[in-house]
Amino acid sequence: MTSRIAVTSAPILPVLAKRWSPRSLDASYEISDQDLLSIVEAGRWAPSAMNVQPWRFSVAKRGSELFGKIASHLGGFNASWSPKSSAYVVVSAFTNGDSGQPGTTSQFDSGISAGHILIQAEALGLHGHVMGGIDHVALHTELGYPENLAVLVVIAIGKGAPAELLEGGAYDREVAMRSRLPLDEIVLHGLPNA
């Protein structure tokens, strides 16, 4: 499997530097219930404004009926590679709080929760790949969610496989150098000097 450790401008935790989102996944790997529980438990312990915890998860292991239903609502390229993943985690968020007013931080908090899921998967020697290319409305209906629970993303969880298993452009994307915008482009004010 391709090593994808980030080249950073300042030291970061090794688990963060190693985290990446492969598309080449081992279709024979079966995730344990304990690892999957650990992954969603990490999501549960994300910080949350006023401790509202607006996130909700639907979890499906490959081979289950729910996994197939989720896969049927993935769009384009995601539909070609992600069914090889060991599990899907649908991350959703309530759009209003107890007050009945729109929750201004619910999607933000749920994004942090998704980040926790990704980092826990990486710590377990697995990978998570966030997919926004989904039919949100159809998946919402399929899952029987209430109107005020919005589907945000689906995360494919699995064990990495050699990039050579991918073809064409997918292979090229898998082995390309990882990059991020430099800090001086994303820190608008107060970037510390190194």
Predicted regions and their residues:
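Acidic, surface-exposed loops and disordered segments
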Residues: M1-A194
